[in-house]
């Protein structure tokens, strides 16, 4: 019956794979074991002595016949005298009935105790407890797991017949069957508990010791007696051998949880079962438990996932499962609601009787808010008429032929499940008292060869021309000093940024400086020295800093990053270097900082792109220091461009062409875990994301494609629809739709042709605005890949501007047509929109 047990246990008690793990701290008291028979070690040993005496001394056999030596000793014939003497036994018969001696040592049987007492020449008694069984136990975790694995393998061979090798084809069922059978074999008295006596009995019956392994059956009791009661119950056997029966109710396999941004939330895993292993949580197939995340940092004793401060980046799908049992999992769809944030335009306006007035309202939130209007606190809906209408899904109040009684405070109210917001747009109807319309004064600033032009887009009028020779306010420096060898004083500009509609920062790469233009006075007020050849500026609104990328030389041999802090302040400005200098940032080829939006007002992190390196360096914008490296080497992607959506917190990485000219697909990076999730399907090219985060537009010059993907309020990225074009898109601008609330249109300028592409993103409708003259050649604009910029005019802006080689074109976005051309503006490829200051 025990033949198979003998085979495996003699091989060293190799145990099966399990999570039961020996630890030095694990100590368990064991119940007393009373031996059934008290052995005297006399008959066989004395017979051996008589034989030995006969062989050595050649004397009479009966010399030791009547000599009784006691336990642990035997009779021998002295070589000198030939007389029978008692000596310590050379060895005991091999059988395994372990006991503890009063000296604290472990002995394989009673005979060994008495033999040791003889050799040590002091009395050793048998102590009736098993504490010494584990003294000097060297059973390691790996050996213990192997031993248990082999026990299961043996049980499988022993009890599962050839006709039924794989009962039900279910590994969990088969393992449970084997462990049940093993437990029944060990539980000799059928009381539902296995104690040390029964373990000893198994070892004794199989004549197994500890000769071939450092692990024995006693280690089951030592390491897997979870309640420390000195017995092994069937449930403890199940835990020991990882036989776990888990359940997940069918109606809980998919759970939907909704929280409001800024709150904390708990996702609880509904997987149940006795001895359930620890719960593992995944997001986008990335295990969260060991990542030490800032906002997801406490998984609780019950395996729940805690998000301490919910943001829109946390939305998406989460899965939970018991460790080692991935086949049973629960999916949590986590939705994040955001209360509405509202803006109205204009805040105030004056109109003469008989003209048309328009009051517009833009609201964002999750889910999309519903809009309503009040006039002086009363709902205007009952008063709607041909003269007073609501347009664009209620986002615009249109009043034709205004009358004095139309004067009032018009309140736009936005509501969704998370909250409500409102704002007031005031209309004054009065006789020619104010010729200038309140709130109107928005301008394009164009930086070109002959200085700076400030242009009002409606009538295409120049409001100001700052000449190259004009002096900085309060200084002797000129806006564009005449360069040595130049016959004509001219300006060279790279990029420019708007800082809170108060200042414009603009880079002068050939002068190693950044100029500050004061919007209120429309004068240049300061020059900030930078590292050589500053080419790219970005305004980080969250921290009020302007980031400056300088090349060092035109060959980009020593690029650096600098920061101008307190950018909107009135004090004199200066640059500071990012840290650490000379390590992470000194090879910067480009950088990316997400743009703040109506809903997302704080941006914490940005990225540095290094030339020809398949990595992203993450930086903390608050400390301006390196955080970590995200490796893209497995995807063979050298990053060239990035875009970001707060809906699910995804970065889209556009990759450079490889050595064969092939462009790898875009990569997706999860901002919650900083993990690369894989490719964005087969979408390639430069990514752009709409201000509301809902549209991803990818421009693939190689394939001649514009690909549009919609991102849902759950952060799901939908399949792309394609627009084929040979325009070679240079730059892209988003403009809110004038006919549909919560929708956007795009305008794309061409780097080689004279047309601008218009796409209505919701419908896919495409139109071309033609005959806008040729752009600058790429070699005439070395500062970036956008040799023909296109600039929108803000949240409520109707106009866009795009330069050609020597003209400016202002487009009417509401009518989708050319508004006007302004000629004799050469190299005007740096354009900034400034709204109401």
Segments (PLM) and residue ranges:
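Repeated scaffold domains used in trafficking and secretory/extracellular systems
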Residues: 433-437, 473-497, 532-543, 581-599, ...
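Short coil/turn segments that connect the beta-strands within blades of beta-propeller domains
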Residues: 440-442, 501-502, 542-544, 603-605, ...
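A short beta-strand motif characteristic of beta-propeller blades
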Residues: 461-487, 523-528, 570-589, 625-633, ...
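Structural motif
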Residues: 450-458, 512-516, 555-565, 613-618, ...
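Blade-level signature of beta-propeller repeat domains, shared across WD40, Kelch, NHL, RCC1
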Residues: 794-837
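N-terminal signal peptide
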Residues: 10-29, 837
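Immunoglobulin-superfamily
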Residues: 48, 77-79, 94, 131-186, ...
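Residue position within the beta-strands of beta-propeller blades
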Residues: 446, 506, 548-549, 608, ...
């Amino acid at each position: 019956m025990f033949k198979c047990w003998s085979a495996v246990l003699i091989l060293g008690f190799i145990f099966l794979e399990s999570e039961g793990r020996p630890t030095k701290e694990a100590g368990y008291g064991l119940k007393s074991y009373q031996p059934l028979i008290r052995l005297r070690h006399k008959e066989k040993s004395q017979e051996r002595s008589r034989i030995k005496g006969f062989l050595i001394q050649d004397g009479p056999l009966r010399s030791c016949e009547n000599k009784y030596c006691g336990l642990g000793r035997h009779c021998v014939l002295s070589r000198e005298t030939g007389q029978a003497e008692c000596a310590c036994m050379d060895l005991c018969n091999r059988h395994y009935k372990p006991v503890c001696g009063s000296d604290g040592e472990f002995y394989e049987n009673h005979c060994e105790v008495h033999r040791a007492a003889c050799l040590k020449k002091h009395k050793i008694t048998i102590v009736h407890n098993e504490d010494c069984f584990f003294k000097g136990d060297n059973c390691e975790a790996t050996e213990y797991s192997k031993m248990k694995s082999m026990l299961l393998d043996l049980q499988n061979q022993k009890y599962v017949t050839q006709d039924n090798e794989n009962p039900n084809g279910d590994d969990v069922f088969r393992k449970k069957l084997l462990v049940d059978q093993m437990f029944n074999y060990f539980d000799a008295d059928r009381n539902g508990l296995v104690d040390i006596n029964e373990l000893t009995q198994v070892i004794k019956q199989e004549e197994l010791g500890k000769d071939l392994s450092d692990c024995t059956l006693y280690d089951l009791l030592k390491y897997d007696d979870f309640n420390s009661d000195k017995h092994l119950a069937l449930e403890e056997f199940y835990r020991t051998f990882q036989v776990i029966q888990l359940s997940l109710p069918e109606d809980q396999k998919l759970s939907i949880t909704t929280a409001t941004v800024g709150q904390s939330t708990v996702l609880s895993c509904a997987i149940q079962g006795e001895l359930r292993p620890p719960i593992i949580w995944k997001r986008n197939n990335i295990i969260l438990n060991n990542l030490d995340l800032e906002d997801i940092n406490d998984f609780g004793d019950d395996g729940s996932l805690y998000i301490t401060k919910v943001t829109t980046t946390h939305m998406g799908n989460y899965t939970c499962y018991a460790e080692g049992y991935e086949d049973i999992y629960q999916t949590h769809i986590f939705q994040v609601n955001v209360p509405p944030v509202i803006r109205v335009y204009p805040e105030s306006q004056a109109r003469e009787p008989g003209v048309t007035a328009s009051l517009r309202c833009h609201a964002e939130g999750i889910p999309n808010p519903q809009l309503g209007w009040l006039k002086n606190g009363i709902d205007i809906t009952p008063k709607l008429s041909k003269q007073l209408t609501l347009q664009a899904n209620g986002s615009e109040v249109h009043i034709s032929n205004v009358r004095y009684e139309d004067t009032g405070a018009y309140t736009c109210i936005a509501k969704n499940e998370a909250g409500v917001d409102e704002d007031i747009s005031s209309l004054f109807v009065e006789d020619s008292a104010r010729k200038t319309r309140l709130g109107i004064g928005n301008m394009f600033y164009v930086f070109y060869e002959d200085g700076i032009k400030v242009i009002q887009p409606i009538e295409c009028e120049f409001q100001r021309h700052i000449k190259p020779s004009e002096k900085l306010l309060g200084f002797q420096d000129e806006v564009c000093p005449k360069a040595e060898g130049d016959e004509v004083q001219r300006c060279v500009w790279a990029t420019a940024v708007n800082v809170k509609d108060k200042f414009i920062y603009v880079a002068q790469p050939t002068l190693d400086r950044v100029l500050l233009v004061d919007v209120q006075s429309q004068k240049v007020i300061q020059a900030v020295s930078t590292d050589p050849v500053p080419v790219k500026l970005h305004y980080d609104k969250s921290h009020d800093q302007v980031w400056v990328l300088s090349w060092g030389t035109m060959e980009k041999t020593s690029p650096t990053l600098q920061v101008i802090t307190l950018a909107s302040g009135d004090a004199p400005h200066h640059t500071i270097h990012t840290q650490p200098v000379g390590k992470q940032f000194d090879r910067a080829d480009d950088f990316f900082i997400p743009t703040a939006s109506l809903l997302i007002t704080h941006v914490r992190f940005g990225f540095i792109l290094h030339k020809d390196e398949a990595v992203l360096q993450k930086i903390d914008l608050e400390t301006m220091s390196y955080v970590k490296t995200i490796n893209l080497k497995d995807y063979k992607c050298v990053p060239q461009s990035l875009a970001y959506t707060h809906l699910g917190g995804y970065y889209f990485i556009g990759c450079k062409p490889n050595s064969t000219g092939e462009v790898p697909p875009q990569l997706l990076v999860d901002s919650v875990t900083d993990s690369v999730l894989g490719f964005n399907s087969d979408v390639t090219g430069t990514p752009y994301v709409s201000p509301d985060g809902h549209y991803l537009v990818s421009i693939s010059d190689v394939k001649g494609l514009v690909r549009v993907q919609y991102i849902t309020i759950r952060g799901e990225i939908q399949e792309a629809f394609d627009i084929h074009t040979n325009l070679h898109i240079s730059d892209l601008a988003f403009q809110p739709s004038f006919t549909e609330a919560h929708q956007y249109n795009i305008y794309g300028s061409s780097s080689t042709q004279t047309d601008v592409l218009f796409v209505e993103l919701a419908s896919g409708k495409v139109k071309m605005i033609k005959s806008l003259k040729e752009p600058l050649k790429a070699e005439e604009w070395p500062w970036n890949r956008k040799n023909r910029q296109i600039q929108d005019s803000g949240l409520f802006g109707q106009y866009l501007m795009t330069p050609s080689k020597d003209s400016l074109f202002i487009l009417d976005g509401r009518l989708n047509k050319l508004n006007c051309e302004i000629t004799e503006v050469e190299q005007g490829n740096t354009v900034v929109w400034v709204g109401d200051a």
